[in-house]
Amino acid sequence: YYIIKDLPEDTRAAGRAAVKSFGVKSRFIHFEFFRMTENQASMGKKGQIVALEVNMRPCGGFTPDMINFARSTNVYKIWADMIAFGGTDLPVGEHFYCAFAGRRDGKHFVYSHEQIMQKYQDNMRMVDRIPDALSGAMGNQMYVANFSTREGMEQFYSDVLAVTDDTNAAAQAELAQVLALGEPDAAPAAPAAKLTAAKPARKARK
């Protein structure tokens, strides 16, 4: 998943309307919406924002840190200032796309961890192993990286998640569709320069 560079105004308006509707004050909250990809008589029209969840707590996982990276800010200090002083003067800085990618152990990836780190060393913000309790949903090895452009982020996902078996083409096509859901009006990314694939490991002799 990823944090988009600039929040669409309809999403911002929906979030603020939810805050007002629930009378929320001095809470670190997150709301979940989805955008309709086609017309549904019982739900709404294509492109419309529909509410899914209202959560009176911070978003889970690494998301608060990713918001910090994506907005060059500190949501923890903003929250503390809000509780202590009723507001904050902490500015929001430059905006980025912030991407989370998780790899599962046992898969044969086209590019090694070392190659990914070499190519994206200037983009990386967090790199770590994921605890076993969370790995079922998030993978075993995680990467969080910032990008100024959508194209750069899409190439990052393509590189990190590329596998050597015959499922790769289908997986890459599905990845492109999923990424497009975040910004439906964004044009498809142009292909970027590729890494040199890692040499396959030799099989151990029995």
Each model region followed by its residue ranges:
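A short beta-strand motif that forms the metal-chelation/ATP-contact edge
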Residues: 41-58
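Active-site "cap" helix and flanking loop/linker of ATP-utilizing ligase/carboxylase catalytic domains
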Residues: 12-31, 55-106
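Peripheral (often C-terminal) accessory segments that flank ATP-dependent C-N-forming ligase machineries
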Residues: 80-206
